[in-house]
């Protein structure tokens, strides 16, 4: 590891070794992705029972090895059932989704790495199973046409870009703020019939466009890569919804609180947005287990608050409103 893996002047000193390790592993993973090969080959299943691709395993091994010498006591990975002890003298605990969006490898859509940093406690459980607001750092690396990192240490969102000349992340912006005017929402509309009524009602209002109660025309986006969705919303605004639904295995949502939702929520709030499970702020919650799932809504603060308001309506009112909308029934 070298000091040149990331520009460190705006990184808190006690977090610099871990950030240098994350940047180094991210740059190395970006190079592996650029070289190509059969990276989407199925190789097994992870701790959650999701299919693993070859690149999932490569990414997990790479980040684990690189963080081992960076002052990290505990490492929790989405790809592993239990947290791993790295350095008994380490002061940090890192939770990581080494490769988000691996289903997009074959189609060459942007994929990423999501990470979260906590102060290390005596046990892995105490380090990770705590309120998400106790994070001291969080971010993601996006591997797309340009490789970039967004990270927060609780004082705004910093934007770094990977310089291909020396594989170092250079600071692009010190305080990224999310626009609040984008008329865009991201949701997998194929699951409409399974959603709870407040989510259907919100989407129906958006789809009604200028003739509906919102009196504005909205565009829908869906990439099926959380990092790519987050990056677009940080840059352009809008809102992302991945609600719980009626399907088996989706009753509590699908995204993981520790590895995905907590770090993204920290970033989004630091950029001026909001992040909830549909009702309650993600940062006010904690994961009861390492792989706990949760519904997830994030984006421009006004839009996230509006969705929460739909959930607060009495069920009879939502049902009455829903009965008059039902645009997908036509």
UniProtKB/Swiss-Prot annotation:
Disulfide bond in keyword set: no
Gene3D superfamilies reported in the protein's UniProt record: 3.40.190.80, Fructose-1,6-Bisphosphatase, subunit A, domain 1 (3.30.540.10)
Cofactor-binding details, from the entry: Binds 2 magnesium ions per subunit.
GO CC terms: cytosol
Intracellular or extracellular location(s): Cytoplasm
InterPro entries xrefs: FBPase_C_dom, FBPase_class-1, FBPase_N, FBPtase, Fructose_bisphosphatase_AS
Top EC category: hydrolase
EC number(s) given by UniProt: 3.1.3.11
Keywords: Carbohydrate metabolism, Cytoplasm, Hydrolase, Magnesium, Metal-binding
Protein residues bound to Mg(2+) 1: 78, 97, 99
Assembly mode: Homotetramer.
Similarity field: Belongs to the FBPase class 1 family.
Stated name of the protein: Fructose-1,6-bisphosphatase class 1
